[in-house]
Amino acid sequence: MDRPETLHVDKPWGSFDQYALNTACTVKILTCGPGHRLSLQRHAHRDELWVALEDGAEVELDGKTMSPRKGEEIWLPRGSVHRLGCHASAGQPARILEISLGSFDENDIERLEDGYGRA
């Protein structure tokens, strides 16, 4: 699936950002505590768009590490190897808005590495 276009619309009262329109998707807010991280993982049946809700996140994507700023978007195509973490010095959890696109269930995850014994 191609990455959906993010639409920014200015209004007299402010603005809104639209991430999906009339698309089957699952929307979550991921919260990762300081010094913690999710499994290094990939998915076969879903693409994901992550939007940083505040600073402090650390994202690994296909061998590269980045620290997205609040509002920054990251596209995770199906099959990409990725993980979310939170810098130990962040002082607060990292939160990511996750929009998953595709036909899948929660078993659509291949854990490649996991600090909690689930790989």
Can you annotate each of these PLM segments?
Residues P4-R42, R46-D47:
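A short glycine-rich, His/Asp/Glu-containing loop-to-beta-strand
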Residues G63-V81:
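Short acidic-glycine-tyrosine-enriched beta hairpin
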